[in-house]
Amino acid sequence: MEVAPESTIAPGMIDVHTNGAEDVLFNRDQGSAVEVAARSYVKQGVTGFVAGIITAPWESMLHAASEICESANQLEEQGGIGARCLGIHFEGPFLNPKFRRVHRGDWVLRPTVERAREMIDACHGALVMVTLAPEVEGAEEVARFLFDQGIVCAAGHTAAKYREGMLAIGLGFRTLTHAFNAMPPLDHRDPSLLVAFMQEARTTVQLICDGYHVAPPMVDLLYRTVGTRLVLATDNMPPSGTGYRIDGGVVRSEDGTMAGSALRCDQAVRNLMSYADLPFERAIINASAAPARLLGLERDLGTIAEGKRADFAVWDEELRVVATVVGGTPVYGAVHLHQRTAGIGG
């Protein structure tokens, strides 16, 4: 394939934390949301996403997971329509009630291995990540179980401090959900678990890089500390339900609490470039290779190399996505795939 000479080919991006797309939510629209997300995400240069299920009545969470997996499998068999669903992420219900934010308190549950098994069964083997608070009762046993199953344990919606964070990493927690958000502030005398994840090379740190959830100077500081271990994640929340609105670039609940972002992955890359003074070829790593490593998919995804899956996006000279290819098949902006390329990022 050839593209315009002023264009750049870069690896397809992966969003590991998304709650839906357009006007659909995975929790509510379930299977039907997968195709909408698949077609929507490629417009941003995203070739893979993890469908997020947020805290809700337990049985409804399990049902949503099952429906999403069935729909994703059907789309995979059809092939060539858009971004691929790479698995399921349960953001809850095993959270610290004090840091639940917009997650309803009466739906928060104590983590148990039995419930973890129910998650796995509902996802038909496609559960790839679970966000839980490492300090709550039962979290240690569940974290060990999930780690043994090869499922990523993400620390989030947590009151954990530094020591608890280090213990969590020792148990198998490998990533931090939306750094700085829904956790204690960064305190120089009594640091939170964020510092543990910043220090520990085995981990990654996810960030909502919209300039609202985390101020640009803190984004710069975080990048300087963790570099390619920083994973750009949108945590986008389509404001399609009652009680939510877009305000100042973020989605808020009726009481003003941040409920998620209105962020696109391509904008997250441009923001990181601006906030941390990075060239494109470095910032794109945090939206492609870094999330691929987090999910254990770096052998097939995240970079452009011989033998890897042909997932990539074409960016124009103004760093706007103009075409996306998934598995070697053009799924967006095929008209732009006709001339020679100027360079390859990532």
Regions found by a protein language model. Give the residues of each.
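Conserved, mostly hydrophobic/aromatic
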Residues: 17, 41, 90, 146, ...
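Divalent metal-dependent hydrolysis catalytic cores, especially in the metallo-beta-lactamase
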Residues: 19, 35-64, 82-96, 123-135, ...
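Active-site mouth loops of central-metabolism enzymes
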Residues: 20-32, 53, 102-109, 152-156
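Active-site core of metal-dependent hydrolases
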Residues: 27, 117, 121-240
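Active-site gating loops and adjacent loop-to-helix segments of metal-dependent hydrolytic enzymes
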Residues: 39-50, 96-124, 167-179, 183, ...
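His/Asp/Glu-enriched, well-ordered alpha-helical/loop segment
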Residues: 196-204, 223-314
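C-terminal cap of metal-dependent C-N hydrolases
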Residues: 293, 303-346
